[in-house]
């Protein structure tokens, strides 16, 4: 028996087989979960190709968290693909305009781009959870992905601010949904060689930091440890844990220079 036997899980933001979301979906299926995945726009075509590698091939829904109708219809569309109950939601959604809001552009970023970064990367945790809530009739687990937002990283800029907002948002979500048996936690991963990271100007600087300082070492090409942490938080192994940030970074967050 797997740790997710009988559970229904929505995994958002699955774009490529190097993405954390893909590995989460793969492991969740291996652990017994029924999985539905989502993406939107032009990325849907890539997602559809990638999920053919999963067994079974999960349903793919279009979900743009900046489109209200995508959210208001989500529960009905999940029912249409046979998911009448949701036990777990994986928030793998983030966006900041790399040309204007990252790579050293912190002081010059347009307000509209900052608004979009925070709305899509942080507020969407709430809007996604609330869209799924009608199907979370037996409680459940919401798990998001962050990158340690307690310090100012080079090049990360307004995405770092958005991640700080995400971390606070998860704590408030834990507070308000806890009485209904719904947990909200985040996994703070070290830098991984994903499409998202490649879009960040200057992100290669992270690799040297982790390579030199992480007590356990760090393999930026292995998203397995991060995905396993997400799956564990989706399971019943953490029934009294909410509002938490689990660090999967080789221990770097715990050490000084």
Q: PLM features: residue spans?
A:
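Aromatic pocket-lining residues of Rossmann-like dinucleotide-binding sites
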Residues: 28, 177, 233
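Short, flexible catalytic-loop segment of classical short-chain dehydrogenase/reductase
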Residues: 184, 188-199
């Amino acid at each position: 028996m797997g740790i997710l036997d009988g559970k229904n899980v929505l995994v958002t933001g699955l774009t490529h087989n190097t993405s954390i979301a893909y590995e989460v979906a793969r492991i969740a299926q291996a652990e017994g979960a029924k999985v539905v995945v989502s993406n939107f726009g032009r990325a849907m075509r890539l997602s559809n190709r990638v999920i053919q590698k999963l067994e079974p091939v999960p349903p793919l829904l279009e979900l743009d968290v900046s489109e209200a109708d995508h959210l208001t219809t989500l529960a009905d569309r999940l029912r249409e693909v046979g998911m009448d109950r949701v036990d777990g939601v994986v928030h793998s959604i983030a966006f900041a305009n790399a040309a204007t809001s990252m790579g050293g552009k912190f002081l010059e970023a347009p307000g509209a781009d900052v608004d979009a970064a925070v709305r899509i990367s942080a507020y969407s945790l709430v809007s996604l959870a609330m869209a799924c809530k009608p199907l979370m009739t037996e409680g459940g687990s919401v798990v998001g992905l962050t990158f340690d937002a307690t310090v100012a990283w080079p090049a990360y800029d307004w995405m770092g601010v958005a991640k700080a907002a995400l971390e606070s948002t998860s704590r408030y979500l834990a507070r308000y949904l806890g009485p209904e048996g719904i947990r909200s936690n985040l996994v703070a991963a070290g830098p991984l060689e994903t499409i998202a990271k490649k879009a960040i100007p200057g992100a290669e600087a992270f690799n040297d930091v982790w390579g030199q300082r992480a007590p356990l070492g760090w393999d930026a090409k292995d998203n397995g440890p991060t995905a396993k942490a997400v799956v564990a938080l989706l399971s019943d192994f953490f029934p009294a844990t909410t509002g938490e940030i689990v660090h999967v970074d080789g221990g770097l967050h715990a050490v000084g220079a």
